Amino acid sequence: MANYLDFEKSIKQIDDDISSAKIRGDDSAVEILKKNLEKEINKVYKNLSEFQRLQLARHPDRPYSLDYVRALLKNYYEIHGDRVFRDDPSIVCFLGYIADKKIVVIAEQKGRGTKYKLKRNFGMPHPEGYRKALRVAKLAEKFSIPIIFFIDTPGAYPGIGAEERGQSEAIARNLFEFSDIKTPTIAIVIGEGGSGGALAIGVADKLAMLSNSIFSVISPEGCAAILWKDPDKSEAATKALKITAEELKELNLIDDVIKEPKMGAHRDKDAAAKAVGNYIIEKLNELEKIPLDEILRKRKEKILNTGVFEEL
């Protein structure tokens, strides 16, 4: 049973009509309704608002990092622990192969269903998760293995324990280390890219977003609560924040947009995985042809050209 979003009500109605026509055995009605459905889908998805893309990015059926790992990697092996405090299940790390290319995957995992959402802390990493990511990245650097980051988090965990164990230091350390790690890196936002929680594994040679994913300095709800003292203003905040892939590409804050299947990645997970896999292979092939010194120079140049600042 498909989970329909609020703006998909007209699509749901036609889908329901098709199901009823099939039960009646009315083949001619089914064919007509299928054509109407195609038109309605094109109409609804032609000009999605920022808030609608936010809803798609948070869709409960959207493929998570482990879905992409299982679909794309062969002979993969999970790597656990930060060797300092504990293993954080919100960050998952793998050594494996994609199209016969050896890679390391470092990813944020939200978890599906109550049990696994709690296990993965809803995709909000603790500092030990980011330290695990750095430990595994350093291992990849040692053996000259490219790193693929999958970003999907509402943000780093803001709990007391996380702060006591140095959440801000862990994020800052990753920003520092990943800006100069001596191996090719590719980061892909597959759902939510929430603030520092996303940036902590988001410094890379190539940064891409799925077309219905979002990347923001703060959640729209948090922004609305701060600016307007009203969480109900989240739709206006979504528009003001410029969080969509297209907007961030126009601002030169990301490198590429990976097109999702019609109606979102959750509607065709195999097609979504194929698109992500093709992107990874294409960019790995590009980076393999560039000397490491040049990769590092371009990465540093890219970081220094990000954003706007004034020197006082």
Swiss-Prot record:
GO BP annotations of the record are:
fatty acid biosynthetic process; malonyl-CoA biosynthetic process
Q: In which pathway does it act?
A: Lipid metabolism; malonyl-CoA biosynthesis; malonyl-CoA from acetyl-CoA: step 1/1
| Catalytic activity field | N(6)-carboxybiotinyl-L-lysyl-[protein] + acetyl-CoA = N(6)-biotinyl-L-lysyl-[protein] + malonyl-CoA
MF (Gene Ontology): acetyl-CoA carboxylase activity; ATP binding; carboxyl- or carbamoyltransferase activity
Enzyme Commission number(s) from the entry: 2.1.3.15
All copies of domain CoA carboxyltransferase C-terminal, residue ranges: 25-286
Q: Where in the cell is it found?
A: Cytoplasm
Q: What is one cellular component GO term in this UniProt entry?
A: acetyl-CoA carboxylase complex
Q: Which UniProt keywords apply?
A: ATP-binding, Cytoplasm, Fatty acid biosynthesis, Fatty acid metabolism, Lipid biosynthesis, Lipid metabolism, Nucleotide-binding, Transferase
Matching Pfam families: ACCA
Q: Reply yes or no: does the keyword Chaperone apply.
A: no
Among PROSITE patterns, the record links this protein to: COA_CT_CTER (PS50989)
Leader peptide range in chain numbering: none
Q: What does this protein do?
A: Component of the acetyl coenzyme A carboxylase (ACC) complex. First, biotin carboxylase catalyzes the carboxylation of biotin on its carrier protein (BCCP) and then the CO(2) group is transferred by the carboxyltransferase to acetyl-CoA to form malonyl-CoA.
The record's section on HAMAP family has: AcetylCoA_CT_alpha
Q: What do we know about how this protein assembles, alone or with others?
A: Acetyl-CoA carboxylase is a heterohexamer composed of biotin carboxyl carrier protein (AccB), biotin carboxylase (AccC) and two subunits each of ACCase subunit alpha (AccA) and ACCase subunit beta (AccD).
**Family as reported in the entry's similarity comment:** Belongs to the AccA family.
For this entry, the protein name equals Acetyl-coenzyme A carboxylase carboxyl transferase subunit alpha
The primary gene name is accA
